[in-house]
Amino acid sequence: MKKIRLFIPLIIALFAVLSFAPTALAFCGFYVAKADTKLYNQASQVVMARDGNKTVLTMANDFQGDVKDFAVVVPVPTVIKEEQVRVAQPNIVERLDAFSAPRLVEYFDEDPCSPQIRPQSMLAPTAAARGGSSEEKAMADNSLGVTVEARFNVGEYDILILSAKESNGLETWLNRNGYKIPRGANQLLKPYIRSSMKFFVAKVNLDKFEESGYQFLRPLQIAYESPKFMLPIRLGMINANIEQDLIVYILSPQGQAEVTNYRTVKIPSNMNIPVFVKNEFGDFYKSMFQTFYTKEDKKVAFLEYAWDMGNCDPCSAQPLNTEELKQAGVFWLDNNGNNNNRIAPGFGFPFSNNNVYITRLHVRYTRNKFPEDLMFQTTSNRESFQGRYVLQHPFTGNLQCSAGREYKRSLSRRFEQEAQTLAQLTNWNIQNIRQKMKLTVGNISTSWWENFLMFLGL
């Protein structure tokens, strides 16, 4: 039996994983590094392409273990038919992650004794089923208040759409049919049943998985129509004893998306920090996120990126092209500019225009701080925002002029400000920061006679 690690992290928050396996000016400057989801061991990712009441939801996975043990249960707002489900390209979530990740940029000071005319803007280079007759099973299902609304196969997945009258019956049905429910599922299933939601249940078809040749399970993509713009995160909390990270990419033709039942807060951005952070950017961003997550009482959604998908400045990765946007679920694209009746591949939604605005939201949640599912709304706000952190390298050549001596004198104040900023952002020890800065930039200091010449204005 193949043992795998799924290629793209799964939205643990959205799924109950039922298995034995262990449980994933302009913005110009030179792009250096990004803080992508690889920083978080259990980072879950979901893509929501939404226009009006129409949504295409792409779900990715970080399940580890035998594929025969993998299964997910996802609350959905309506009955899902076979034509509304497909498997997505495995790299599409990674592309969105790379494009929208918080990024580190760097600048290099010019020679103050030989100033150059700086262009106003500069684009950065890119970073690169069990036995028994069907009649018997139907009778047993009905006695539990569970109805199988649909049953089909998509790619390497066998999929069921269930409705239920009460949570005990659904829990019993799932256990009888080989889905091992974690303790506590009963109480968390109740609110979804009361809300008349359905349950999307998927497990791996081993024969089809072997035939596919893939070494990982591909993301599942679901298209549906509902006024509810939400993610049901509560069910997934059954599996987690620790804080979980959820990254939500919302694609919209309108503008920024936000969480409505919790505050949406911008991640700190546009800060100058010491140049040694270039080699420690992952540690820096994790520490900074934890610091502000704690300051906000651990119950906010952080905005990490909001931008028109057609451009970026600086670019941590190339913007997604038209085909990639379609793979991400965008169904309102119109390549020809005047054909509004084309159909999104695999789904029944027509294209309408080519606006795509991306919002990246980062939620770190626990059951006590996030007792409700996430509710969203899109807005008309098209303001650009990114988590962006700046390295400003000092000029280290000869400074044999008055402007050079003044520049050199100013560096100590600048370095101290960068150290203080880093300490405030991360709660790192200020003395350790200062020591690392000395090792990085060397001993750039002014002598007594240079200070005297500056005092004389020379």
Where are these predicted regions, by residue range?
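A cross-kingdom signal targeting lumenal/periplasmic-facing segments of multi-pass membrane
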Residues: 86-154, 334-345, 350-352
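Short hydrophobic-aromatic micro-motifs
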Residues: 56-58, 156-163
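Surface-exposed, glycine/proline- and aromatic-rich loop segments on solvent-exposed faces
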Residues: 48-112, 170-191, 196
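A mature extracytoplasmic/lumenal domain signature
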Residues: 61-63, 76, 163-166, 206, ...
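Cleavable N-terminal signal peptides
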Residues: 13-14, 24
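Bacterial N-terminal signal peptides that target proteins for export
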Residues: 1-11
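Sec/Tat signal peptide C-region and signal peptidase I cleavage site
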Residues: 20-26
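Accessory, solvent-exposed terminal regions and/or long lumenal/extracellular loops of proteins
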Residues: 29-39, 126, 181-421, 425, ...
